[in-house]
A protein has these predicted regions:
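Short histidine-centered catalytic/ligand-binding loop motif
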Residues: 2-6, 26, 108-116, 180-183
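Conserved active-site and cofactor/substrate-binding residues in soluble primary-metabolism enzymes
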Residues: 4-15, 57, 84, 88, ...
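Short intrinsically disordered coil segments
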Residues: 5-9, 93, 171-173
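Substrate-recognition/cap regions that form aromatic- and gly/pro-loop-enriched pockets
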Residues: 67, 72-144
Length: 206
């Protein structure tokens, strides 16, 4: 959901190979695409720079590369703003990719999902967090996929707190990082918040 916090091994490898002339001309063209298509994490190399006020900028990263029988296969992970037209995004990206001699074998997209920050339920859920922690929280929209998109009238609601310092080195401890962990204190607060949230939502449904 936040590729800008790291570096793409695929892009670094492609750049090193191209700059040092380690491949013949044909193979070098394959890796030139991998380098030029992802100069940043915001789709500029794919001509897909989308952004909206609610969900921010589109992100795109070549997340995995396979080479089998001289055929290169690249998986591109894109997180689009909720207002973006996925068919339009596919059309633009396809044109750029085919211009490099590649082709799209599969394009799968999930429509964006969003609940208004000012909606009654979201406001009350936020209030409960603030009551338990004694500090201000602001709801936000992100590109990560959650189970919320699979359930009607649901929102992602969990104890991921960026302000908490964990007693481990930088680059460790967060989601999908080495030593991924959560503070025990967070789990206890989360249990209290979830109980209060369930009771609150139950009252709203009555």
């Amino acid at each position: 959901a936040h590729p800008e916090d790291g570096e793409s091994a695929v892009v670094l490898l492609a750049k090193f190979i191209c700059e040092n002339g380690l491949l013949d001309a044909d193979d070098s063209e394959i890796f030139r695409f991998l380098w030029e298509a992802f100069p940043d994490f915001y789709g500029s190399g794919l001509k897909a720079e989308y952004e909206d006020e609610i969900s921010g900028r589109l992100t795109a990263v070549g997340s995995s590369l396979q080479l089998n029988d001289r055929v290169a296969r690249l998986c591109i992970d894109m997180r689009c703003p909720i207002t973006a037209d996925l068919q339009e995004v596919e059309k633009i990206v396809r044109k750029v990719i085919e211009g490099y001699g590649w082709k799209i074998c599969s394009f799968e997209g999930n429509p964006g999902y969003y609940r208004d920050n000012d909606g009654r339920e979201v406001r009350r859920l936020t209030d409960i967090c603030q009551e338990v922690y004694g500090r201000t929280f602001v709801p936000y929209c992100m590109g990560g996929g959650t189970y919320a998109r699979k359930l009607p009238n649901a929102v992602g609601y969990g104890p991921g707190l960026p302000f908490q310092k964990k007693p481990i080195p930088s680059g460790h401890g967060k989601g999908h990082q080495p030593d991924e962990c959560v503070c025990v204190e967070n789990l206890l607060y989360a249990a209290e918040i979830y109980v209060k949230a369930i009771l609150m939502l139950d009252e709203m449904l009555e």
